[in-house]
């Protein structure tokens, strides 16, 4: 049963990181395009970009918390 907990932990971390990774890539790509088209709004775009990255990265942190809960046997 310990082996299945390790597999579940690995899946929680791995799959929990795919979505935020893609999301952050899309956010940064959009920010770079926006700054390239209109360099005067760089400060505002960068601020919104970091806010978006923080919210997106929270999803990966939730996946990591779930993985810890599975790994330590709190969730089964």
UniProtKB/Swiss-Prot annotation:
GO terms for biological process: proton motive force-driven ATP synthesis. Keywords: ATP synthesis, Cell membrane, CF(0), Hydrogen ion transport, Ion transport, Lipid-binding, Membrane, Transmembrane, Transmembrane helix, Transport. GO terms for molecular function: lipid binding; proton-transporting ATP synthase activity, rotational mechanism. The keyword S-adenosyl-L-methionine does not apply. Its main location: membrane. It is a multi-pass membrane protein. InterPro entries: ATP_synth_csu_bac/chlpt, ATP_synth_F0_csu, ATP_synth_F0_csu_DDCD_BS, ATP_synth_F0_csu_sf, ATPase_proteolipid_c-like_dom, F/V-ATP_Csub_sf. It holds the Pfam family ATP-synt_C. It is found in: Cell membrane. One of its GO terms (cellular component) is proton-transporting two-sector ATPase complex, proton-transporting domain. The keyword ATP-binding does not apply. SUPFAM superfamilies: F1F0 ATP synthase subunit C. Coiled coil: none annotated. The record marks 57 as: Reversibly protonated during proton transport. The chain crosses the membrane at residues 7-27, 50-70. F-type ATPases have 2 components, F(1) - the catalytic core - and F(0) - the membrane proton channel. F(1) has five subunits: alpha(3), beta(3), gamma(1), delta(1), epsilon(1). F(0) has four main subunits: a(1), b(1), b'(1) and c(10-14). The alpha and beta chains form an alternating ring which encloses part of the gamma chain. F(1) is attached to F(0) by a central stalk formed by the gamma and epsilon chains, while a peripheral stalk is formed by the delta, b and b' chains. Belongs to the ATPase C chain family. F(1)F(0) ATP synthase produces ATP from ADP in the presence of a proton or sodium gradient. F-type ATPases consist of two structural domains, F(1) containing the extramembraneous catalytic core and F(0) containing the membrane proton channel, linked together by a central stalk and a peripheral stalk. During catalysis, ATP synthesis in the catalytic domain of F(1) is coupled via a rotary mechanism of the central stalk subunits to proton translocation. This is ATP synthase subunit c. It comes from Chloroflexus aurantiacus (strain ATCC 29366 / DSM 635 / J-10-fl).
């Amino acid at each position: 049963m310990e082996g299945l907990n390790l597999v579940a932990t690995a899946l929680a971390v791995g799959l929990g990181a795919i979505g935020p990774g893609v999301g952050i890539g899309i956010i940064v790509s959009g920010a770079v395009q926006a700054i390239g088209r209109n360099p005067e709004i760089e400060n505002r775009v960068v601020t919104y970009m970091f806010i978006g990255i923080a919210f997106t990265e929270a999803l990966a942190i939730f996946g990591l918390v779930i993985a810890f809960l599975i790994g330590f046997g709190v969730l089964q």
